[in-house]
Amino acid sequence: KNGGKIVFTMSALKSSTDIINKSYSYIFDSKLQKFLSTKNKDLILKDCTTQLEKIKKLRVLIIGDAIIDQYDSVKPLNKPIKENILATKYIGSEVYLGGVFAAAVNLSEFNNNITICTAIGNDKDIKNKINSLPKKINKKIYIEKKKITTRKKRLVDSAYKKKISEVYYIEDDFLSKSNSVKINNYLSQNLKNFDVVIMIDYGHSFINKDIYSVLAKKSKYLAINCQ
């Protein structure tokens, strides 16, 4: 009625996923690429889900630095005439639990028996957040009353959501001797109850030689995430 012409071609079908996979195949080494090309994808998926089911039953201890991640949203203003700096207008703040807390929350998606062992300072703005962690996360938290928890504050451009600068509040000698002794005693008595121990060490003075020594000697399986 309106004219036109339909042509059926015999060219190979191309999909965006196939093109992307082939274009970025250099990301994988040759052995992994060969493995992925020969294995049935459904079997790989089944194997992955089986492994995740096994993880769910493990008793896991996550020990290491507690971190407060603070994001201050700001609006950049014109550069001050008298100083060569960037001036910003404060919009608002968002505070999140990082370090061992973030790791525990992520792992709790796959595991129902997690214990956190860490120390925090006298920061009042994180107590409610700690109490609101998933109930299946057990908490063994020691308090340093005269210290502050490591806090990483970022200034974020409110329009483009990009970081402008960062300020870290860190106590170089965060963990007191008394709490170090308490933690070592706890580990010595309870490490036998955990199938896996994940040590998270960001270099913020929580993991000391004594703590590392008892973890290395008495953990059934020790995984280390450090910076």
What annotation goes with each model-predicted range?
Residues K1-K34:
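Active-site cores that bind ATP or allylic diphosphates and position pyrophosphate for catalysis
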Residues N21-K82, K89-Q227:
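Ribokinase/PfkB-type carbohydrate-kinase core domain
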